[in-house]
């Protein structure tokens, strides 16, 4: 990455353990796309007035030449995102898939549909 990883926390205190997990996941993204310019990660806990569990949201913004890849896991469909590490894993898994798709497009290895 050309620009250092940026990590921010909203509605929660920063955690060195969470930051370390994010750094490891972000480092692995370079396997999927070798031209990553920068990456910003925002981990957000719900406002304190919510009463039904804490569902964390994780947003990953990745800059590659000519495009920004944004993955936002803000509204999880299940209760698994009560664990911040699961929310991080899901966001980075989705980011890896998107980066693979972008890398394929850049190489021209995208399957095209035959016209009828």
Describe each PLM feature range.
Residues 1-116:
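N-terminal, polar/charged subdomain of small-to-medium soluble alpha/beta proteins
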């Amino acid at each position: 990455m050309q620009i250092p990883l940026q990590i921010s926390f909203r509605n929660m205190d920063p955690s060195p353990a969470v930051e370390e997990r994010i750094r490891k996941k972000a480092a692995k993204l370079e396997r999927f796309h070798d031209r990553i310019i920068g990456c910003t990660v925002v981990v957000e806990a719900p406002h304190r007035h919510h009463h039904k569990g804490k569902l964390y949201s994780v947003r990953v913004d990745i800059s590659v030449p000519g495009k920004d890849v944004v993955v936002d896991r803000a509204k999880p469909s299940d209760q698994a995102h009560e664990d911040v590490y699961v929310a991080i894993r899901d966001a980075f898994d989705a980011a890896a898939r998107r980066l693979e798709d972008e890398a394929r497009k850049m190489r021209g290895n995208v399957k095209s549909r035959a016209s009828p």
